[in-house]
Amino acid sequence: MKFVDDLYRYEGESAKLKLVQFRNVLFVPPIQYIYFFRKLQNSRFIITRIFLLCVFRFLQYLYNIQIPYQTKIDKGFRILHYGTIVVNPNTIIGKNFNIAQGCLIGFAHGKREGVPTIGDNVVMGANSIIVGG
């Protein structure tokens, strides 16, 4: 996925402008996280991956967001408010997904064992929990 597809959810048509992209990556914490999330997913060279992984790990601790870069999230990903967001790396998420602070998407044991698959156009409000397959 491309970062511009995610930024479109924040900025609309102006997301294609390089100045708007630059401004948001510098000053908007959720967009910084999404930018490095997408860059790390799409990086091919080992040196680039190591650098991006270091920055990504720093942002995870800084903003308290734990969405591993292995997580499959389609275009239109939006973090509404950052802080205490945890997602299982095996989760599959569809298009236009919004997530707020205090959310958890995790693995469950028992009858509904597994990891959730979340469809398109889903909004997870504050302090929501989705577990199981």
Give the positions of each predicted feature.
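Left-handed beta-helix
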Residues: 68-69, 74-75, 80-89, 94-95, ...
